[in-house]
Structures are given as structure tokens and as C-alpha cells.
Amino acid sequence: MEKQSIRGKRRARKFALQALYQWLMSGTDLHEIEAQFRTINNMDKVDGEYFCRLLYGIPTHVEALEASLLPYLDREINALNPIELTVLRIGSFELFHCPEIPYKVILDESVSLTKEFGSQEGYRYVNGVLNNLAKQVRSVEVSLDNE
């Protein structure tokens, strides 16, 4: 993958985290949130298609994504820090719906987002949950990587 494509996806995740956090906290319509982000932010270097894939895909699959996370959580979904919950939703969506992205990249990007926006030690929790989910969802990829 080209560096520009990698950076564009990274920026898309960052904006998607902020947009999905806004959706979680306010319930604002996703189309309105997208319009706000495109108006307020310089999205020239953002992979806009990937941003929309996350922005619209995660709410569409939110119940299934959260159900997939439950076995690996030590608390109820509603007790999670909203940023960490949003990062977990993004990471789980990517694990299930973006097979073109290696699971290690998904984990690394999720950890980076949590370090930047989440609580001080939240990245460890996010990494542990998504690593366990990856072992189930991407079992072949994980086992090949561990050989």
C-alpha cells in the first residue's frame, strides 16, 4: 500500500472516530455530521471513501459489532469510556469488514487512536480486546503470523 494511501486511511480513521463520537454523544444524523466534517475540516489528504465506509458502516452494524466484543470485555458496553468504545467499534468493524487491512495494522491504528484521544491506559484495554477478537475473526491470519 502506498504511503499516501496509508496516511489517507489513518486520517480517515481519526475523523471517523471524532464523527462517530459525536454521533454517539448527540445522536445527530450521520449525513449532517458528514456535512459538518467536510465543511469544517480540510479533508484533501483524507481517504474520503474510507471515512464514509466507517462513518456509515459502523452504525449499520453496531449491534453485531458490540455483540462480538462482549466476550472480551470486563464490563458492560455502557460502562466503557465513549472514546474507547468508539475505537473498539472501528477496530471490530475493520476486523470483520476490511479483510484487505492486516489485523496488526488494525490493532496498531486502534492503539494509536486511543493513545491520542482516550484515557491514559485505555490503549492497553483496547489492544487486549481487539487482539482477542482478532484471534477469533482472523484466526488463520493470526496463526500464520505467530508461526
Curated annotation (Swiss-Prot):
Protein's GO biological process: DNA-templated transcription termination; transcription antitermination
Keyword ATP-binding listed: no
Top-rank taxon: Bacteria
InterPro entries xref list: NusB-like_sf, NusB_fam, NusB_RsmB_TIM44
GO MF annotations in UniProt: RNA binding
Pfam families: NusB
Entry keyword set: RNA-binding, Transcription, Transcription antitermination, Transcription regulation
GO cellular component: cytosol
Disulfide bonds: none
Gene3D superfamilies named among the record's database cross-references: NusB-like (1.10.940.10)
Family: Belongs to the NusB family.
NCBIfam families tied to this protein: nusB
Matches recorded under PANTHER family: ANTITERMINATION NUSB DOMAIN-CONTAINING PROTEIN, N UTILIZATION SUBSTANCE PROTEIN B-RELATED
Function: Involved in transcription antitermination. Required for transcription of ribosomal RNA (rRNA) genes. Binds specifically to the boxA antiterminator sequence of the ribosomal RNA (rrn) operons.
Name listed for the protein in its UniProt record: Transcription antitermination protein NusB
Organism listed in the record: Legionella pneumophila (strain Corby)
Gene expressing this chain: nusB
